[in-house]
């Protein structure tokens, strides 16, 4: 009986996602799994020459500054 109970507990632990982490885009196609304390995905524009802008993406603890910041808290929301 103890063996059955232990088996059920182990299966439950393996099936549950006890350590949920956020996944954000780091580049245009590249993704990164955020650290547990990073709860925000961000995207903002870095001014470049000739009126162009380079997007910066990643994980953070708060919404950063920058041109046209976009911050969100769901997986892959900073495309």
Swiss-Prot record:
Disulfide bonds join 24-41, 34-59, 63-71, 72-77. Expressed by the venom gland. It is found in: Secreted. Keywords: Acetylcholine receptor inhibiting toxin, Disulfide bond, Ion channel impairing toxin, Neurotoxin, Postsynaptic neurotoxin, Secreted, Signal, Toxin. Residues 1-21 form the signal peptide. Pfam families: Toxin_cobra-type. SUPFAM superfamilies: Snake toxin-like. GO terms for molecular function: acetylcholine receptor inhibitor activity; ion channel regulator activity; toxin activity. GO terms for cellular component: extracellular region. Gene3D superfamilies: CD59. Its main location: secreted. InterPro entries: Snake_3FTx, Snake_toxin-like_sf, Toxin_cobra-type. Binds with high affinity to muscle nicotinic acetylcholine receptor (nAChR) and hinders acetylcholine binding to the receptor, thereby impairing neuromuscular transmission. Competes with the binding of alpha-bungarotoxin on muscle AChR (from Torpedo) with an IC(50) of 0.30 uM. Causes muscle paralysis, spasms and increased respiration. Belongs to the three-finger toxin family. Short-chain subfamily. Type III alpha-neurotoxin sub-subfamily. This is Short neurotoxin 2. It comes from Pseudonaja textilis.
């Amino acid at each position: 009986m103890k063996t059955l109970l232990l088996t059920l507990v182990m299966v439950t632990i393996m099936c549950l996602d006890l350590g949920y982490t956020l996944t954000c885009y780091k580049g245009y196609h590249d993704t990164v799994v955020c650290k547990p304390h990073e709860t925000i995905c961000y995207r903002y524009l870095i001014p470049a020459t000739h009126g162009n802008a380079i997007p910066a993406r990643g994980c953070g603890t708060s919404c950063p500054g920058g041109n046209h910041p976009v911050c969100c808290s769901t997986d892959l929301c900073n495309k």
